[in-house]
Curated annotation (Swiss-Prot):
It holds the Pfam family DUF3889. The keyword Signal applies. Keywords: Signal. It comes from the Bacteria. The gene is yhdC. Residues 1-21 form the signal peptide. This is Uncharacterized protein YhdC.
Length: 107
């Protein structure tokens, strides 16, 4: 019975540590997405000069393999009288965070 308060305190400390670790990871992920988003946005603007853009969205992250992770972004492009969606895929190394490539293509 004397060990019950000790056990509760230990569980509480464990929960605090786990929640701190989870928060730190999500912040790193958010910063990583922002980095790749800026690069994708620049590449899309270069590909479609003079166009207007709307509905820009982050579609998600996929682990391609141990050496590559992919972030995908989508935007609606209006160029002259044509409106269409464009997808940008940013490939990067998940450990070093070095960019491997950016692919932009019309959907």
């Amino acid at each position: 019975m004397k060990s019950l308060p000790y056990t509760i305190a230990l569980l509480f400390c464990g929960l605090i540590i786990v929640s701190m670790a989870a928060k730190g990871h999500s912040t790193d992920t958010d910063e990583s997405v922002q980095k790749w988003e800026q690069l994708a946005w620049s590449k899309i603007q270069d590909e479609y000069k003079g166009a207007s853009f709307s509905d820009y969205a982050y579609m998600g992250r996929t682990e391609v393999n141990d050496q590559q992770t992919k972030d995908v972004f989508r935007v609606t492009v209006r160029q002259k009288d044509d409106t269409f969606s464009v997808r940008a895929e940013v490939y990067f190394h998940p450990v070093t965070n070095h960019m491997i490539s950016i692919n932009v293509f019309r959907l």
